[in-house]
Amino acid sequence: MSEVIEKAKRAKQASFKMALSTTDDKNEALQLISQAIINHKQEILTANALDIEEGKKKGLSEAVIDRIRLNEERLQDIADAILQVTILTDPIGEALEIIEKDNGLFITKKRVPIGVIGMVYEARPNVTVDAASLAIKTGNSVVLRGSSSAIESNKALIQVIHQSLASSSIPKEAVQLIEDTRREVANQFFQLNEYLDVLIPRGGKQLIDTVIKQSTVPVIETGAGNCHVYLDESAKVEMATEIVLNAKLQRPSVCNAIESLIIHRQWFEDHGLELLKTMQSHDIKIHGDSVVMEKFPPAIKAVERDWEKEYLSSEISVKIVDSVSEAIDHINRYGTRHSEAIITENKMNAEQFQLQVDAAAVYHNASTRFTDGFEFGYGAEIGISTQKLHARGPMGLEALTSTKFVISGSGQIRE
């Protein structure tokens, strides 16, 4: 039996035990994991250094290296995120609806675990812990398939998780890592309908498209982040500048960073050159349309692929439009339905943008960088869904549950 089938089978068996776990059981396990990550930080960082070294040898970009990189601060953030999950209300067992029939039947619609969640993700080792913690809290098993670029980090984290679970009431088999990172193993993983209830890809567009095309397991699509900020005609200059710089530069390699800036023509005429010079002074490489090129020659001429590209670095495309409607049309054509922002003092334009833009999160006068489970109060997230069925936006605890009808009677039969 192959590794992937064997581990998926173990996870499936563990999921039935997980269904009996109490909130206290789950929280105790998460507290143990959080503390163990801090206690074993040196082993984790040593493993991470191997991934970083190997990544540099392979010529991975600095953006990818940053995604792989762990340090004491990031490990503390990971541990804190786990503790945040422990204080969240456990959704499992919640009665969503109670119906009492005339014949005496009690029908209760309850929130229950999904069962076994398959995760496919790229360079971020923090996803290993995020996915495990959310799965445990919601009574699910999880099978993780990360990238070869972070395999040593993932193995070290899973070892810490398993050691912690061994001291808890939660079966360690509920969290599995596929260590074989070959593509053919991934393809096998995508078709384990017998063991997996859902598959969640988390990464770039190519990974997500591959999973959607090849998977026979139901998929929750977490989209790439080709996010936009639109500066409307009435946008305040200082606010617009601060939001653009934050949304682009605070952490360029993440999915809620902006990749494209859209500017109303009048605003651009009045303030555009000043903004572009400020962006250039922050080492942002600008790809502009013909209007931008005319006013700011240092820019690079934007081509079609720039409007749909997720740079994941200090690069940005800039387009000039004549109206909020034109900005919306551009976003709906090239965006990835993730996070979009409008900066404006015009309430009607803000409302039009919020209603017509097709995205999981739509902002008015705020940075797109807030699209995050922790920022939204969900604790660690398993991904940001850009589809419209089952879950949309940051996927916290409730997104990892299903429902079950529990019917209690006293001998009723249907006549």
From Swiss-Prot:
Top enzyme class: oxidoreductase
Name the UniProt record assigns to this protein: Gamma-glutamyl phosphate reductase
Sample GO molecular function, one term: glutamate-5-semialdehyde dehydrogenase activity
GO cellular component, one term: cytoplasm
InterPro entries per UniProt: Ald_DH/histidinol_DH (IPR016161), Ald_DH_C (IPR016163), Ald_DH_N (IPR016162), Aldehyde_DH_dom (IPR015590), G-glutamylP_reductase_CS (IPR020593), Glu-5-SA_DH (IPR012134), GPR_dom (IPR000965)
Biological classification of the source: Bacteria, Bacillati, Bacillota, Bacilli, Bacillales
Origin species: Oceanobacillus iheyensis (strain DSM 14371 / CIP 107618 / JCM 11309 / KCTC 3954 / HTE831)
Compartmental location: Cytoplasm
Pfam families with a match to the protein in the record: Aldedh (PF00171)
Main localization of the protein described in the UniProt heading: cytoplasm
